[in-house]
Amino acid sequence: MLQPKRMKFRKMFKGRNRGLANGTEVSFGEFGLKAVGRGRLTARQIESARRAMTRHIKRQGQIWIRVFPDKPITSKPLEVRMGKGKGNVEYWVCQIQPGKVLYEMNGVSEELAREAFALAAAKLPLKTTFVTKTVM
């Protein structure tokens, strides 16, 4: 699963997921899966969607993952009293704003790409849409 190799600080503030997205254009492949809603993706969800797509296209074509989980989420163990510091890092997430391209695909037909992205979208907690590369 995806996570940073090393970080300057182990734990992070919760923060707020506001603002506009970077990476809103399909830049590597022909087709993309774009987030419509706002939320956060865990490393497990990103990997699960990637596996679903890879299996469906039967290893033809190429897939790019355009998001990376770089925010640690902590939690305290069950039945532990309040206080005594922040909990341990449990998993990693990336915050998603509307318009962010999550995955890209190349080397397959549009029909196959749509089916693969539909399988991937079912694994994700966000509303997504299928996009194609715009040629200027």
UniProtKB/Swiss-Prot annotation:
One of its GO terms (cellular component) is cytosolic large ribosomal subunit. It comes from the Bacteria. Signal peptide: none annotated. GO terms for biological process: translation. Keywords: Ribonucleoprotein, Ribosomal protein, RNA-binding, rRNA-binding, tRNA-binding. Pfam families: Ribosomal_L16. The keyword Iron-sulfur does not apply. NCBIfam families: rplP_bact (TIGR01164). Belongs to the universal ribosomal protein uL16 family. Binds 23S rRNA and is also seen to make contacts with the A and possibly P site tRNAs. Part of the 50S ribosomal subunit. This is Large ribosomal subunit protein uL16. The gene is rplP.
